[in-house]
């Protein structure tokens, strides 16, 4: 019997969830399915952009797919770039991140035969039927990260969040992190800085260093390249750190507790397969659970590093993780 790795299992779970929501079938249309991935950052950021790109690249090995990507797209450029690929006949245009939500609302109605997917929240109750949005449990994972940060803090004084672009998603992730920390361990203060930039490691390092200087002894980021600077500051400041979007253990093997890895590759593949199968369904928001969308990874140690996370802290965290997944902890309520 072939055993599945946790990554494989999570991919299959995600695929099943999307299949149920989009009506994915395994019989694809004979014609070519062209897919383009649009990113505000780069494909080599070690996480958010890279994992989505890896999913896109994996389509090259599947019959009937044509792929393209464009990176480092500014907010002002989004409509023009999206229209360009739609004009070229691409069947699926993926906007990877919050920045694409509103611009796609303007573009999609002009291209009813093109499918659009945004890996971010539904921006308004009614949207065109050819756009699919997604609530990828960002706030749930931020609350969980805050809880774990508080549990593994040695000083039990302060833990910090480093954010990227200044948008509602990042602001609410910061709020959820703070709530998770402060509700989990009494006396711990959650602090956060949204740097306004996803692609500036120097900003991330400076922000994290400031927090560490003010007493924070655990840092978590959700800031792509900017977050790499935060990890560096944690190493130099000899404090604990939590990774995001990918397994970042190798960047700080002695400091990292775990990484919250996002199954972005599976998201891209299964959405593309829905389009290929003719069963893509837009006009809605897909909502996977925390455990469906996120993995806990710590390199060779498994799901956590026992050198930085005690058995007691991990057991408490696991209960919180399961309760969020089961909706017993209502993270959305703490953001109101």
What is each residue range found by the language model?
Residues 1-17, 23:
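N-terminal secretory signal peptides and thylakoid transit peptides that target proteins
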Residues 18-19, 280:
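A generic secondary-structure boundary signal that marks alpha-helix termini
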Residues 24-29:
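Sec/Tat signal peptide C-region and signal peptidase I cleavage site
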Residues 30-336:
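A residue-level marker of the well-folded mature domains of exported/periplasmic proteins
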């Amino acid at each position: 019997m072939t055993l599945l790795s946790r990554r494989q299992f999570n991919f299959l779970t995600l695929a099943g969830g999307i299949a149920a929501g989009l009506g994915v079938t395994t019989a694809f249309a004979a014609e070519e399915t062209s897919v383009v991935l649009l990113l505000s950052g780069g494909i080599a950021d070690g996480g958010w952009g890279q994992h989505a790109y890896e999913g896109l690249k994996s389509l090259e090995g599947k019959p009937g797919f044509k792929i393209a990507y464009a990176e480092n797209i500014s907010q002002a450029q989004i409509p023009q770039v999206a229209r360009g690929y739609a004009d070229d006949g691409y069947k699926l245009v993926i906007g990877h991140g919050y920045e694409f939500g509103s611009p796609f609302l303007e573009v999609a109605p002009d291209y009813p035969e093109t499918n659009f997917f945004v890996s971010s929240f539904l921006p308004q109750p009614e949207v065109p039927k050819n756009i699919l949005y997604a609530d990828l449990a960002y706030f749930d994972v931020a609350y969980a990260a805050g809880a774990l940060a508080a549990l593994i803090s040695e000083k039990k004084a302060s833990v910090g969040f480093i954010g990227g672009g200044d948008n509602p998603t990042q602001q609410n992730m910061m709020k959820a992190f703070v709530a998770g920390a402060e509700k989990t361990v009494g006396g711990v203060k959650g602090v956060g800085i949204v740097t306004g930039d996803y692609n500036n490691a120097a900003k991330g390092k400076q922000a994290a260093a400031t927090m560490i200087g003010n007493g924070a002894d655990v840092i978590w980021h959700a800031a792509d390249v900017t977050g790499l600077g935060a990890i560096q500051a944690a190493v130099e400041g000899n404090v604990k750190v939590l990774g995001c979007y990918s397994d970042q253990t190798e960047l700080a093997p002695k400091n990292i507790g775990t990484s919250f890895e996002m199954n972005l590759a599976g998201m891209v593949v299964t959405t593309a397969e829905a389009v290929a199968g003719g069963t893509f369904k837009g006009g809605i928001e897909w909502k996977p659970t925390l455990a469906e969308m996120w993995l806990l990874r710590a390199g060779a140690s498994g799901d956590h590093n026992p050198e930085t996370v005690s058995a007691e802290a991990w057991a408490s965290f696991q209960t919180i993780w399961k309760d969020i997944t089961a909706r017993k902890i209502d993270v959305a309520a703490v953001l109101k």
